[in-house]
Amino acid sequence: MARGGVPNFGGGNINNLMKQAQKFQQQMEEMQGQLENKKFQASVGGGAVTAIANGKKEIVDIRIKPEVVDPDDVEMLEDLILSACNEALKKAEHETANEMKKLTGGMNLPGMF
């Protein structure tokens, strides 16, 4: 056992661990910055409604083809908007999870994103 009664933390190992943690944190911040600037687009209804989300999982744009707007069927348009938004957010979440897996080597670190 290493000095201080803590196994595997003697000598320079703690310094190496701290350096690795700092490097990991820097890589995470870089990845977050890149993802925040990415756009994730989803279209539904044959392209009638398109939603665009960013890497912060915010809807930043919604596009609706004019021919889809029917004052007598507002509910259909609402459903299309919800579907497009949810799909764009799923794409952003999926990409974030994939990038996180690459960074962590597949380790699951809950609460990181």
UniProtKB/Swiss-Prot annotation:
Protein localization: Cytoplasm, Nucleoid
GO molecular function terms noted in the UniProt entry: DNA binding
Entry keyword set: Cytoplasm, DNA-binding
Pfam families: YbaB_DNA_bd (PF02575)
Main location group: cytoplasm
Signal peptide, first to last residue: none
GO terms for cellular component: bacterial nucleoid; cytosol
Function: Binds to DNA and alters its conformation. May be involved in regulation of gene expression, nucleoid organization and DNA protection.
NCBIfam families: DNA_YbaB_EbfC (TIGR00103)
PANTHER family: NUCLEOID-ASSOCIATED PROTEIN YBAB
Self-association state and partner proteins as the record states: Homodimer.
Family: Belongs to the YbaB/EbfC family.
Name of this chain's protein: Nucleoid-associated protein CTC_00074
Native species: Clostridium tetani (strain Massachusetts / E88)
